[in-house]
């Protein structure tokens, strides 16, 4: 179905979600669309969309769907039994996957798509900021809010679109970008892919879609990526750590005054210094992908570095929620062992005091597949608090419980691990036992982010 012409009516099921809201925002700003949507609860994102002209309903109901709607957009987070899905099918209204709609929007621009198991949102945000700060006026669709643009999306008048490419359900294969980034490949979303080999095959297909004039930006620190990029017909530029053999290499320097620093080299030529106000080696690597794109678009390194100095992070990516009574509260989306390990490493390098981490496992399937790896990822935590699993759209699996992760943690001297089932239990405990000098770090892809706000409130009331 071609969504062209005046006042086409498009309905989004789960419009407040990170990926859905970005697409809805761009369509609202384009004009020519009447956008409606539904979500299970009101949020700042819903308020923002309504201010742009969207009609949003709270709750998924059959009555939200009618014959005047031209198309309904949904994501894999929406159950096939959702009443709005069923009503859409009954009325014969076209159902469009979120990835299909993103692909349609990208066809109107020169697409820059960022894929990978980890670092997508940050790398997309950094790339978007570089283009935004250097007058490219890109269209942007990100999986997290970027303070520099006041949200997670914007319609630009320039020729480029920068977007996050979601591999979780294979929908990134619908995209036809001009530039594609792959940050890394991991054993994630095995509920969809089945095997690691299938994951690697999908990323290979993603890169193989690039034309001869296209550009693949690849992290050479990932051994799987080294293998799957062989024989690509597009242009390939690589980035990685010092000594990796990549085109762009980063020499990590000591963090000073909270500034994450590194020297950037291109084929052994020193380009200059990179300074980031977000911690962690993984963020320096993310920045290297953005540097490679900026240079491909003929930007001087100093202009790129200047833009990145303004980067303060994306929402829920090592986001400082607040500081009260000497206690710093930070929130991060980390929900895979590699992300948990990298986030705690960033916390350790940037914070001299005790690190208290609250981790909410996300999905029963992921916990079952990776509980041993999760157990090994908490090395840099001093006090580790584990809560019950956030189910997302899954049903419980027999024998799968947070205790699997707890039992897999090899306790080090001075480390303490607690199981506190609910976020309220964790908030009650931390309100009494968090100390001045602590960094309290909430991690997970569920609703654990609410804990940081609640803790700040409790500490302010003390």
UniProtKB/Swiss-Prot annotation:
Its main location: cytoplasm. GO terms for biological process: cell division; cell wall organization; peptidoglycan biosynthetic process; regulation of cell shape. ATP binds at residues 116-122. Its EC number is 6.3.2.8. It catalyses: UDP-N-acetyl-alpha-D-muramate + L-alanine + ATP = UDP-N-acetyl-alpha-D-muramoyl-L-alanine + ADP + phosphate + H(+). One of its GO terms (cellular component) is cytoplasm. InterPro entries: Mur-like_cat_sf, Mur_ligase_C, Mur_ligase_C_dom_sf, Mur_ligase_cen, Mur_ligase_N, MurCDEF_pg_biosynth, UDP-N-AcMur_Ala_ligase_MurC. GO terms for molecular function: ATP binding; UDP-N-acetylmuramate-L-alanine ligase activity. The keyword Ligase applies. It is found in: Cytoplasm. Pathway: Cell wall biogenesis; peptidoglycan biosynthesis. The keyword Cell cycle applies. Keywords: ATP-binding, Cell cycle, Cell division, Cell shape, Cell wall biogenesis/degradation, Cytoplasm, Ligase, Nucleotide-binding, Peptidoglycan synthesis. Cell wall formation. PANTHER family: UDP-N-ACETYLMURAMATE--L-ALANINE LIGASE, UDP-N-ACETYLMURAMATE--L-ALANINE LIGASE-RELATED. Belongs to the MurCDEF family. This is UDP-N-acetylmuramate--L-alanine ligase. It comes from Desulforamulus reducens (strain ATCC BAA-1160 / DSM 100696 / MI-1) (Desulfotomaculum reducens). The gene is murC.
């Amino acid at each position: 179905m071609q969504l062209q012409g005046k006042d086409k009516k498009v309905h989004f099921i789960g419009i407040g979600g990170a990926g859905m809201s970005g697409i809805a925002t761009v369509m609202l700003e384009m004009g020519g669309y009447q956008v409606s949507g539904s979500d299970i609860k009101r949020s700042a994102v819903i308020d923002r969309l309504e201010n742009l002209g969207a009609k949003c309903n709270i709750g998924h109901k059959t009555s939200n769907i009618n014959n005047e709607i031209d198309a309904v957009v949904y994501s894999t987070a929406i159950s096939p039994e959702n009443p709005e899905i069923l009503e859409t099918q009954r009325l014969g209204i076209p159902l469009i996957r979120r990835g299909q709609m993103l692909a349609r929007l990208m066809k109107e621009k020169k697409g820059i798509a960022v894929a990978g198991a980890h670092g997508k949102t940050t790398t997309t945000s950094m790339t978007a900021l570089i283009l935004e700060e250097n007058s490219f006026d890109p269209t942007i669709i990100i999986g997290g809010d970027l303070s520099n643009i006041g949200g997670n999306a914007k319609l630009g008048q320039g020729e480029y679109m920068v977007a996050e490419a979601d591999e979780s359900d294979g929908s990134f294969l619908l995209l036809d970008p001009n530039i594609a980034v792959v940050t890394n490949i991991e054993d994630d979303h095995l509920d969809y892919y089945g095997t690691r080999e299938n994951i690697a095959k999908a990323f290979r297909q993603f890169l193989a879609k690039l034309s001869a004039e296209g550009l693949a930006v690849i992290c050479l620190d990932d051994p799987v990526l080294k293998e799957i990029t062989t024989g690509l017909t597009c242009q390939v530029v690589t980035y990685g750590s010092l000594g990796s053999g990549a085109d762009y290499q980063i020499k990590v320097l000591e963090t000073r005054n909270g500034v994450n620093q590194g020297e950037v080299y291109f084929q052994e030529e020193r380009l200059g210094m990179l300074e980031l106000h977000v911690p962690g080696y993984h963020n320096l690597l993310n920045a290297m992908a953005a540097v490679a794109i900026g240079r491909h678009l003929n930007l001087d390194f100093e202009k790129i570095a200047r833009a990145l100095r303004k980067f303060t992070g994306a929402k829920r990516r090592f986001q400082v929620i607040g500081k009260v009574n000497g206690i710093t509260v930070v929130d991060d989306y980390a929900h895979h062992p590699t992300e948990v390990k990298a986030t705690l490493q960033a916390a350790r390098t940037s914070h001299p005091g005790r690190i208290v981490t609250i981790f909410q496992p996300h999905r029963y399937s992921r916990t079952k597949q990776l509980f041993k790896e999760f157990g090994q990822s908490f090395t840099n935590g001093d006090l580790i608090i584990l809560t019950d699993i956030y189910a997302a759209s899954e049903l419980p699996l027999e024998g799968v419980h947070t205790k699997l992760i707890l039992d897999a943690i090899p306790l080090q001297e001075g480390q303490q691990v607690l199981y506190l089932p609910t976020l309220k239990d964790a908030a009650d405990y931390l309100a009494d036992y968090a100390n001045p000098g602590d960094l309290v770090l909430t991690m997970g892809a569920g609703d654990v982010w609410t804990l940081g706000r609640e803790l700040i409130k409790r500490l302010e009331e003390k």
